[in-house]
């Protein structure tokens, strides 16, 4: 089981589990102790990796309550107290020469979702489903090695796992991570992603951030002036760190067409996508990313 906010070590651990022929169980870093313990117990996990966390108390509680569980701490001050340290294991380990065979129907990961009611449900996801979803994404979006990704949505969520982890690993795309929530916007500006996917809530917050600085009536007036129109659009994109983004995406929850229309009016075309955990996130997508095709 892996409980951590997004970081490079998350990727390394997931790859290590694949190469070691283990099944990964990603858990949201905001999960409470009861949820973590349930997922660990239900999945019959033999180890728990704790990493970058806003509050390690819940993870620490599970580790302390389950002494039979192997625990490994990633190299962050906010990680829980564990039996083993990630850096020490890397330094002392002898790389295995064995390479397990991963067939399409072989179980890769158990991803727990809230479901519609009751306890979390574990979706059994295979290597074949992962490979297919990522390859479709790479083909449809045209992901290239010179693209840049920014990973901040929880990697325990299937969307981020496919879009970010899959694209970076199978597409060879460099990926950056936010230092913290407080530095989020500055981190995006520094990295200038060419592909950026988000959720309706964050796109709404971005809109509010813009409107707080530039009221809608004033924005509407400025957008009607031909020369100023292009300048305003450029400045807004730069203010969000998205002026180099060639694909903007939205998924994971319903989004208002009015919000998408608003972004289109300021020169940012957001592509909708829909999928489920059970389908490894990739089911439908607006293609070829046309703002006049909202909802199709």
Residue ranges and their predicted role:
Residues 1-33:
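Conserved AMP-binding/adenylate-forming
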Residues 14-20, 42, 166-170, 207, ...:
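Short hydrophobic alpha-helices that are characteristic scaffold elements of the AMP-binding
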Residues 54-104, 210-239:
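ANL superfamily adenylate-forming
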Residues 93-112, 119, 142-148:
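Conserved pre-ATP/AMP-binding loop-to-beta segment of ANL
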Residues 108-134:
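Conserved AMP-binding A3 loop
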Residues 131-148, 155-235, 244, 269:
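Conserved AMP-binding/adenylation subdomain of ANL enzymes
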Residues 176-178, 244-250, 257-296:
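Conserved ATP-binding loop and adjacent catalytic segment of the adenylate-forming AMP-binding
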């Amino acid at each position: 089981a892996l409980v951590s906010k997004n970081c490079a070590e998350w990727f390394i651990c997931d790859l290590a589990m694949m190469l070691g022929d283990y099944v990964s169980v990603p858990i949201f870093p905001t999960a409470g102790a009861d949820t973590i313990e349930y997922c660990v117990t239900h999945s019959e996990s033999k180890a728990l990796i704790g990493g970058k966390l806003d509050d390690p108390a819940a993870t620490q509680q599970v580790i302390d309550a389950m002494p039979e569980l192997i625990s490994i701490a990633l190299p962050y001050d906010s990680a829980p107290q564990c039996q083993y340290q990630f850096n020490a294991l890397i330094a002392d380990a002898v790389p295995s020469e064995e390479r397990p065979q991963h067939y399409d129907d072989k179980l890769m990961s158990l991803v727990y979702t809230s479901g519609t009611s009751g306890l979390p449900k574990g979706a059994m996801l295979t290597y074949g489903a992962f490979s297919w979803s990522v390859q479709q994404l790479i083909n449809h979006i045209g992901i290239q090695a010179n693209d840049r990704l920014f990973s901040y949505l929880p990697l325990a969520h299937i969307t981020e796992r496919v879009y970010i982890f899959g694209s970076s690993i199978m597409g060879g795309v460099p990926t950056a991570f936010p230092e913290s929530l407080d530095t989020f916007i500055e981190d995006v500006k520094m990295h200038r992603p060419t592909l950026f996917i988000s959720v309706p809530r964050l796109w709404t917050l971005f809109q509010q951030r813009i409107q707080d600085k530039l009221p809608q009536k004033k924005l509407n007036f400025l957008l009607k002036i031909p020369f100023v129109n292009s300048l305003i659009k450029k400045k807004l994109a730069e203010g969000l760190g998205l002026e180099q983004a060639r694909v903007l995406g939205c998924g994971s929850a319903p989004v208002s067409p009015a919000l998408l229309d608003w972004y289109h009016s300021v020169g940012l075309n957001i592509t909708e996508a829909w999928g489920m955990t059970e389908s490894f996130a990739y089911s439908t997508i607006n293609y070829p990313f046309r703002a006049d095709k909202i909802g199709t």
